[in-house]
Amino acid sequence: MKFGISIPVTIGEKWKEKLLECLPQIEEYGFSSLLVWDHYMLPEKYGVKSNNTIDAWTLLSFIAANTTKIKLGTCVTPIPFRPPQLLAKIVSSLDNISNGRVILGVGAGWHKPEFDAYSSWDNNKIRFEKTAEGLELMKKLWTEDVVNFNGKH
């Protein structure tokens, strides 16, 4: 059995120093993975202001630079939130930087205000279609030298 740890993308006073203090312990204690939330905004009930979050993939790059063995990834990255070809580049870049330590958790997204602010909101059916199509394109971009792709979305 493997155990992972999840941390939020919220930032506050001395967040970098606190995180840097914890990272060696996380690896030392034998956690197999460290996952972060992939959100730019959180529901108000969580008590986090939008300007107190950091981009998940930027945070993971910071963590990769300060760790050596723990797997890194997102709890859930909503595929419809970003263009899939951009997400494929972001993920493969981090995988390269971290020497193959990336885990990509995916989903269709759920927080409408976040999509409204940073992307575009679609109904569940469309978001699930975009997720499946985006994954198909991303896999091709990672495994084929030349990609021709004509998706519905």
Model-predicted segments: where are they?
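Internal, glycine-rich beta/alpha segment that forms the wall or movable "lid"
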Residues: 42-47, 83-153
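Structural motif corresponding to the early beta-alpha repeats
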Residues: 61-65, 71-80
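Hydrophobic faces of well-ordered beta-strands that scaffold small-molecule active sites
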Residues: 3-7, 34-36, 71-74, 102-106
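Residue-level "edge-of-site" marker
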Residues: 39, 78, 108
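N-terminal beta1-alpha1-beta2 module of alpha/beta enzyme domains
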Residues: 1-66
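Active-site mouth loops of central-metabolism enzymes
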Residues: 5-17, 75-85, 121
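N-terminal small/glycine-rich loop or linker at the start of catalytic domains
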Residues: 1-11, 69, 110-115, 152
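A structural motif corresponding to the C-terminal end of an alpha-helix
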Residues: 29, 65-70, 137, 141-145
